[in-house]
């Protein structure tokens, strides 16, 4: 009970706190005199400077061990991701809705495509060489200027009807929209053994939806990524490299219904069956064209 | 303990759920991490609560025998009819009748009484029967003659009275409710844990709010800022510590139980360690609780007998003829007998039928002479007169075992002065000599000396009845005493005492050197109390009381300078007249105090007095009436063998062997657990910074999140649990029994130094080490450290599936997520590796690890092994389960933080070295925790 009587009043506590902040008898602030504070701060400054120095040293050593051209490990990029343009995300993944009769609903989509293809204009590709080979373009030496390697040209006109040059509306106006499919870059990745990787778009089977098979027109023809764009040697070796693209023009999309389109990349070393990653080797999107 | 700490955890859990609520409202696909975290926190609190309850219930079960009270009956006059009703049905105003032998059923004011005497010892400690009548004699109800009290006994006579108080309102009921009323005080360890919670909560909340403000200033969304705030607070809560502390305490409790200290209340384990005053009972605790022959006087010489527990080593000179006679008297003039069938039991442990002194004499002679029963058979007893309080002697006449000697032997023992009166000769060296004045003087000196030792002295004499007057056929009559009972031959004196337990003096010395004051509180006579106090060292050999000084200098007690005396013997009568201030002065000024003839209530007063000195008080007791003092004490210690159920119920700890030295073992364990808890907490707090930094860096510099909250839980509740328990097995660094008890307000469990050193030194080093592993993983996968800064928004975006790294490779959202988990695993492993170093450095606070020995505490290695195994299991075993956010980490990343771990060890060895080299220096003051 003796302990219970020691409850301090609020003012006492405040007084004690004030005394702690500044104790006039000993000249202590917050429990230390000024000189003590200087000493302890000096110690901490020194300690932290040394620790930061050591950490910086460790990072420096780490950076020295890193190869500038090829990452040490690529085990987490076994198979490339696939992306779609235009890319409009809804609650669950890509959702592209537009109304043919309302220009405003699809101009933003075509705008996305146009600005994406700006990187594939002949002017942007001026530093790249023309390739015609149907095999991998291996380069062991740094033959290009500035100790780099050559990259192959990919220009928007290779996408023909979906290049935006002949049809500025990319087919959106007539309900046969173009979608551009891009495969992610992975350093020194070889997608297949001999045949070039190919894009294949289908309607995703939905119950209670009897659909005629999807008809697609691919650009470049057959929807292939030519093998001479591979392997990719990294940003430092190929500063001007641009990903090859495939455009898919969907010809028979039913109007006023939401359909799910799945575009896979068919190649020996590209997998699309990872249950966790919806964008590995494939891209899936919902499409609803209204009239 | 459960209060403060689990509230912190509950707050954490609720915050998590709130965070999820907020996230869910803004984005219904929010991850369930916060829900898991909150649930786990809640489960942790509940589990540890159940665990602590189970631990205590286990101890409490032993108390199950309590509350079995025999229903008490009372004779009451109602409706002019005598009725017998249960005592609890009595009401105020009932007229009850009491007769000798009854227990008083309530507090009663007597209306009439015939020779009524009551035994008030359970209430006041007065062992003399008190007479009661109907007269009002004193203002104080305890003093007046016309009130009898509930639970006391009427010894003789009859009385009629009116009930004035029943149940809880009776005097003893008030004592009992006092006992339950004082039970709510917090134990010192609970106060320390609360203090620790304040520190942790303070750090968590202030860092959280600081970064909330920073986040808002950096134009983060307010909802995000709130989620950061919650994450920071949760990262700071040491989830596993509550369980660890409980386990550590129960481990110690188990260890103490092995050493005969049964701990009922887990927190009491530590309380004993901070004890600064022990108020010890005498009988049974300090002493063996059995009369034993201590001294003999014959041939004008005092001999010392062995009073140790086994009593076998009686090394005094037994060649004298006087001893032969004396031993015969001791063996023959004794009515006590061993219970049959105990031949295999050691003599001192055999059960005896007979009173305490006769038992002592029987065992004494059995040890020295061998089979006493056989001796008695050979010396056939003809007649005997048992001891009674008027005669004050005991006498028997025997045929002798010598077949040629037809004389009868008369043997007698009794109060020495009465025996001496009956003697005219004295035996010296086997020869009878006349008892002259000088011999009588020698007898008195010896008698006084033995009496002054607080011992009970008996005189022995014998007489061979002349064969002519008392032929073999003589018929002795004990009623008429037709034989001589004077002019006998005095043989010797023998004194007995309840001797101290042999381990006690050592234990008291240990207490002394440990800075614990031992106060004896006993109902016994002051002289006996003082003698025992001296022999066990409670009053040390060279210290004197005021009375001793007065006697030595031959001056009046009042003239003695009180400052000269180190010791004090205070009786209950003196204590009654003292004001609290005087008692405080007494307790403060005398290092050695004995309270004699004290009542149970006075025991409470003494305990309160000690607590006013800011002391942590341990009290030992066994009676019902001790229970308030036991409750009031910071730690009540009840006796396991002699203790009453009420005392055991009120106590926090039970000495299974009633032995004082067990308390000292308890103190040692208590101090050790305090030190080890300090180490455990330091160990646990350290990683909090390493767990907190990722969030801060994430908020300020926008790195991909280095470690997730679920992963944090696996450190707090996975890898760190066994190691922190292992620290409870650590041996003491130095002799912990050679330092003062900790001051309960100054020596905190978690002090500023501990927090600062753990957070700002080792914790920071750990954070840097863990970040190094994290950066290594990212850099080797393609993201250099510099590119990670301010990458957060792009990194966390689900809609960006071609994020470029430094090599121009493009990552999908899930690929990044997986890399992030690899980062979590790497950061986790970094912390784990450095926690091994942290565990090793925490083994000592001052000594070098090498002095303490790396391998003495095997459990530490079990802890380290468990850490590594759990981490390996998480990474390689569960790496494929994505919900746990672990991935299979490459082998070399496990070693990236090793240099940092070594650095931590080296730094801490340096700290300890400087502390040892420059004690009291600036370094010592700031770095020793």
Curated annotation (Swiss-Prot), chain A:
Membrane topology: Single-pass type II membrane protein
Reported impact of residue 201 to S: Impairs the assembly of an active pump and its targeting to the plasma membrane
Keyword presence, Transmembrane: yes
Keywords: Cell adhesion, Cell membrane, Disulfide bond, Glycoprotein, Hydrogen ion transport, Ion transport, Membrane, Potassium, Potassium transport, Signal-anchor, Transmembrane, Transmembrane helix, Transport
Any one biological process term the GO annotation gives: pH reduction
Cellular localisation: Apical cell membrane; Cell membrane
Mutagenesis or variant effect for residue 21 to S: Has no effect on pump ATPase activity
Outcome of substituting residue 193 to Q: Loss of pump ATPase activity
A Pfam cross-reference name: Na_K-ATPase
GO cellular component, as recorded: apical plasma membrane; endoplasmic reticulum; plasma membrane; sodium:potassium-exchanging ATPase complex
Function: The beta subunit of the gastric H(+)/K(+) ATPase pump which transports H(+) ions in exchange for K(+) ions across the apical membrane of parietal cells. Plays a structural and regulatory role in the assembly and membrane targeting of a functionally active pump. Within a transport cycle, the transfer of a H(+) ion across the membrane is coupled to ATP hydrolysis and is associated with a transient phosphorylation of the alpha subunit that shifts the pump conformation from inward-facing (E1) to outward-facing state (E2).
Description of how the protein assembles with itself and partners: The ATPase pump is composed of two subunits: alpha (catalytic) and beta (regulatory). Interacts with alpha subunit ATP12A; this interaction is required for the formation of a functionally active pump and targeting at the plasma membrane. Interacts (via N-terminus) with alpha subunit ATP4A (via the P-domain).
Name this protein carries in UniProt: Potassium-transporting ATPase subunit beta
Organism this protein belongs to: Oryctolagus cuniculus (Rabbit)
């Amino acid at each position: 009970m003796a302990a219970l009587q020691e409850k301090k009043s609020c003012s006492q506590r405040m007084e004690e706190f004030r005394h702690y902040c500044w104790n006039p008898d000993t000249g202590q602030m917050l429990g230390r005199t000024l000189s003590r504070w200087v000493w302890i701060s000096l110690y901490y400054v020194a300690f932290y400077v040394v620790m930061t120095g050591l950490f910086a040293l460790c990072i420096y050593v780490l950076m020295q061990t890193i190869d500038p051209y090829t990452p040490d490990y690529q085990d987490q990029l076994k198979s490339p991701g696939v992306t779609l343009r235009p890319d409009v995300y809804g609650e669950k993944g890509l959702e592209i809705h537009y109304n043919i009769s309302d220009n405003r609903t699809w101009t933003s989509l075509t705008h996305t495509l146009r600005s994406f293809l700006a990187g594939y204009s002949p002017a942007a590709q001026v530093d790249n060489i023309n390739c015609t080979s149907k095999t991998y373009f291996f380069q062991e030496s740094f033959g290009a200027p500035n100790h780099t390697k050559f990259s192959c040209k990919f220009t928007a006109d290779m996408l023909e009807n979906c290049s935006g040059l002949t049809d500025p509306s990319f087919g959106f106006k007539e309900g046969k929209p173009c979608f551009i499919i891009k495969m992610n870059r992975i350093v020194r990745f070889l997608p297949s053994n001999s045949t070039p990787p190919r894009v294949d778009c289908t309607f995703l089977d939905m119950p209670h939806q009897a659909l005629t098979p999807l008809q697609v027109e691919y650009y470049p023809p057959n929807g292939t990524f030519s093998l001479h764009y591979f392997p990719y040697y990294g940003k430092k070796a190929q500063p001007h490299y641009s990903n090859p693209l495939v455009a898919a023009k969907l010809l028979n999309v039913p109007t006023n219904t939401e359909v799910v389109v799945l575009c896979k990349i068919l190649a020996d070393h590209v997998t699309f069956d990872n249950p966790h990653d919806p964008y590995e080797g494939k891209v899936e999107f919902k499409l609803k064209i209204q009239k | 303990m459960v209060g403060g700490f689990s509230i912190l955890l509950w707050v954490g859990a609720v915050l998590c759920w709130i965070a999820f609520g907020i996230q869910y409202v803004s984005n219904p696909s929010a991850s369930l991490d916060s829900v898991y975290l909150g649930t786990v926190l809640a489960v942790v609190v509940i589990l540890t609560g159940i665990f602590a309850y189970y631990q205590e219930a286990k101890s409490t079960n032993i108390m199950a025998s309590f509350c079995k009270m025999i229903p008490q009956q009372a004779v009451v006059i109602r409706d002019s009819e005598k009725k017998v009703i249960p005592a609890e049905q009595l009401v105020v105003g009932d007229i009850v009748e009491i007769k000798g032998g009854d227990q008083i059923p309530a507090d009663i004011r007597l209306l009439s009484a015939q020779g009524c005497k009551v035994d008030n010892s359970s209430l006041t400690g007065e062992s003399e029967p008190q007479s009661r009548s109907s007269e009002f004699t004193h203002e104080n109800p305890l003093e007046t003659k016309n009130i009898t009290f509930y639970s006391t006994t009427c010894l003789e006579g009859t009385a009629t009275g009116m009930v004035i108080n029943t149940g809880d309102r009776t005097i003893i009921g008030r004592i009992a409710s006092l006992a339950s009323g004082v039970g709510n005080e917090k134990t010192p360890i609970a106060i320390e844990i609360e203090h620790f919670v304040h520190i942790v909560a303070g750090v968590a909340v202030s860092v959280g709010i600081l970064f909330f403000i920073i986040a808002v200033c950096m134009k983060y969304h307010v909802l995000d800022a709130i989620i950061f705030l919650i994450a920071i607070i949760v990262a700071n809560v040491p989830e596993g510590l509550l369980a660890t502390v409980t386990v550590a305490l129960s481990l110690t409790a188990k260890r103490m139980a092995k050493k005969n200290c049964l701990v009922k209340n887990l927190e009491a384990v530590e309380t004993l360690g901070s004890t600064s005053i022990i108020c010890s009972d005498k009988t049974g605790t300090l002493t063996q609780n059995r009369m034993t022959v201590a001294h003999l006087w014959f041939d004008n010489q005092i001999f010392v007998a062995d009073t140790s527990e086994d009593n076998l080593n009686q090394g005094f000179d037994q060649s004298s003829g006087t001893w032969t006679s004396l031993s015969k008297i001791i063996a023959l003039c004794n009515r006590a007998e061993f219970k049959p069938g105990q031949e295999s039991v050691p003599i001192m442990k055999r059960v005896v039928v007979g009173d305490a002194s006769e038992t002592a004499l029987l065992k004494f002679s059995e040890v020295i002479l061998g089979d006493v029963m056989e001796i008695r058979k050979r010396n056939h007893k003809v007649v005997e007169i048992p001891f009674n309080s008027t005669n004050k002697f005991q006498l028997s006449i025997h045929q002798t075992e010598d077949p040629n000697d037809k004389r009868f032997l008369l043997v007698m023992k009794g109060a020495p002065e009465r025996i001496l009166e009956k003697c005219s000769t004295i035996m010296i060296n086997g020869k009878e000599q006349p008892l002259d004045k000088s011999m009588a003087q020698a007898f008195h000196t010896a008698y006084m000396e033995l009496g002054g030792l607080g011992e009970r002295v008996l005189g022995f004499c014998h007489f061979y009845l002349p064969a002519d007057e008392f032929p073999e056929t003589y018929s002795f009559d004990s009623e008429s005493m037709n034989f001589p009972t004077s002019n006998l031959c005095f043989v010797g004196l023998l004194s007995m005492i309840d001797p101290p337990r042999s381990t006690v003096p050592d234990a008291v010395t240990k207490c002394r050197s440990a800075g614990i004051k031992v106060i004896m509180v006993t109902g016994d006579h002051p002289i006996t109390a003082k003698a025992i106090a001296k022999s066990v060292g409670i009053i040390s050999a060279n210290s004197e009381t005021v009375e001793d000084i007065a006697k030595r200098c031959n001056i009046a007690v009042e003239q003695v300078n009180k400052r000269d005396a180190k010791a004090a013997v205070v009786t209950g009568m003196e204590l009654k007249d003292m004001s609290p201030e005087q008692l405080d002065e007494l307790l403060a000024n005398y290092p050695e105090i004995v309270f004699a003839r004290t009542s149970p209530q006075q025991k409470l007063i003494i305990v309160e007095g000690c607590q006013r000195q800011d002391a942590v008080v341990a009290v030992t007791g066994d009676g019902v009436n001790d229970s308030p003092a036991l409750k009031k004490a910071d730690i009540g210690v009840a006796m396991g063998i002699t203790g009453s159920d009420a005392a055991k119920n009120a106590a926090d700890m039970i000495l299974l062997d009633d032995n004082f030295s067990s308390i000292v073992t308890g103190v040692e364990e208590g101090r050790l657990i305090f030190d080890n808890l300090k180490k455990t907490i330091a160990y646990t707090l350290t990683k909090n910074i390493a767990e907190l930094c990722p969030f801060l860096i994430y908020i300020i510099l926008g790195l991909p999140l280095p470690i997730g909250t679920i992963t944090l839980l696996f450190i707090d509740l996975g890898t760190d649990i066994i190691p922190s328990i292992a620290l409870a097995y650590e041996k003491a660094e130095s002799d912990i029994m050679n330092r003062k008890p900790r001051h309960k307000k100054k020596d905190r469990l978690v002090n500023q130094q501990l927090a600062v050193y753990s957070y700002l030194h080792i914790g920071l080093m750990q954070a840097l080490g863990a970040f190094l592993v994290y950066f290594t993983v990212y850099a080797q996968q393609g993201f250099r450290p510099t590119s990670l800064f301010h990458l957060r928004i792009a990194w966390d975006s689900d809609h960006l599936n071609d994020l470029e790294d430094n090599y121009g490779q493009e990552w999908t959202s899930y690929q990044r997520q997986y890399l992030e988990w690899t980062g979590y695993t790497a950061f986790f492993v970094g912390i784990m590796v450095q926690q091994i170093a942290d565990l090793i450095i925490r083994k000592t606070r001052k000594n070098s690890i090498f002095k303490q020995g790396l391998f003495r505490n095997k459990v530490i290695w079990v802890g380290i092994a468990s850490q590594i195994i759990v981490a390996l299991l998480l990474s390689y075993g569960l790496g494929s389960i994505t919900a746990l956010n672990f991935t299979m980490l490459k082998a070399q990343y496990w070693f990236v933080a090793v240099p940092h771990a070594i650095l931590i060890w080296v730094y801490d060895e340096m700290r300890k070295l400087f502390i040892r080299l420059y004690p009291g220096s600036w370094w010592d003051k700031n770095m020793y925790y």
